[in-house]
Amino acid sequence: MKRSDVMHAEVAHAAKDKETRSAVDDPITLQIIRHDLVSIPNQIDRNITRTAFSQLINEYKDYAVGIVDPDGNLISQSRGSLLIFAANALGTAVRDGLSLHGADNIAHGDVLISNHAETLGQHLNNVVMYTPVRADRGRGEIVAFFCVLMHWIDVGGIMVGSCTSTSTTEIFQEGIQFRSVKLMHRGVRSDDMFRMIQCNTRFPEMLTGDVEAQIAGCLLGRDMVGQVVGKYGVERFRAAVIAMWDHARRLSRMAVEAAPRGEFSGYAFLDNDGVHMDRTVPVGVRVRLDGKRITVDYADVADQLSGPMNAGRNGGAVAAARIAIKYLFSPEEPLTEGDFDLLDVEIPEGKFLSAHRNAPLGLSGHMIPTTVDTILRAM
């Protein structure tokens, strides 16, 4: 190559870098992208409400819609659905899938599902479905994952509804598990997977309708995020995401710096453990604030219970702490990973909010409100 050609290429590359930096630094463009990313899950949320079959979804709205980055960090989440789900579940499922498959083996058009108890720490009805958003109309790198978590009305187990028993003693009595398995591969449905799902539920027609709504939400959301990436470019997209996180971090930092410093305690109890109606369950929480970080310490909560009123660490201790912090510090702002940058969660393994592998989790959501309230009371 001639020296003049090299110089021309260097000048063109420098001009392109300058243009990219200028676009990335443009606050108006970043705000437009930010509002797109906040709006898309809300639009898919409404679509799911209209298209799902079961009342748990179209009336109770027992689901969540969100976008996470290639590492599973939350970018945005729909406001109309249950906060507990996307507070921790979406990114946790995606990270586990990446560890199993690797990013290169999750292709455009792949749709994966996970309700793995050890990973998510919630009852098996809560199924995360996710699909990659790849740049360059599906041919480029993964820039995000679009996720829809939905409460499946029945996944087998010893009781109708799967999560309604008070007598289960291990997770295997509560239904079927999926650990980031592909429901679709490169846009082609797995008939084997659909048959497996339909043969492990008491309501195959209704559940299939919900799953179809979940798939449609994933694919439409993926395309909408892909359009944003295609319009503004990967660098602008990433810059907008970082700006969202930075904004949330600033709000959290201001709140932590303004809060009184010290260790604060809260105590409550559950009326029973779901099996023994005369046995209360203590919920003791300590919150430490040092002006820089906030630590939620669950050392004083009850040990793992014999029945299904347990949750794993991600679905119990971490989820409850994140919900409490979000409610306390910036409830009016969109939910994003930056909200939790200053949060540490400490809990020994084997508590009822950090249950061991294979523990029953059927009633995993029942103790979360009390736990959140106890954290808020401590603060």
Question: What are these model-derived regions, one by one?
Answer:
Residues 17-33, 174-253, 374, 379:
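N-terminal leader/propeptide and maturation segments of large enzyme subunits in energy/redox metabolism
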Residues 36-60, 98, 102, 113-122:
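Short, basic/aromatic recognition patches
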Residues 73-77, 88-116:
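Regulatory sensory and allosteric helical modules in signal-transduction proteins
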